[in-house]
């Protein structure tokens, strides 16, 4: 059975909660990702997504240059272990209505699993699989 480690995006981008939303957005653009993990003293304390930036900063007319990511990140997180199976990962995505799940090994972030990763794994006939493998808009 395939494991989370087989499909996760490794080496997640991590930032401190005091970093600006602008810095997080730049990192997302440079890395071609939609998630930055928020670490406090090396421990995962939050997750900020491109959607969080849109909904919690831009839509509320907050200044992304001065708003810290710690103020907008999600802090009630669902996490996976690299050795968890993909059935569990899919169930957590569905049950918690999340699109991205941090992967921790011994408390240290080692990756992120996105709903797109799971869709690609589900096979070429999946509509989500086709959407997930399409070229990104830049």
What does each model-identified segment do?
Residues 7, 25-27, 40-42, 60-62:
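Short hydrophobic/aromatic-rich motifs at helix boundaries and adjacent loops
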Residues 28-31, 36-52, 93, 101-116:
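A glycine-centered beta-loop-beta connector
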Residues 1-11, 49-79, 85-94, 112-138:
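Tandem CBS (Bateman) regulatory domains
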Residues 14-32, 80-97, 103-104:
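The conserved cystathionine-beta-synthase
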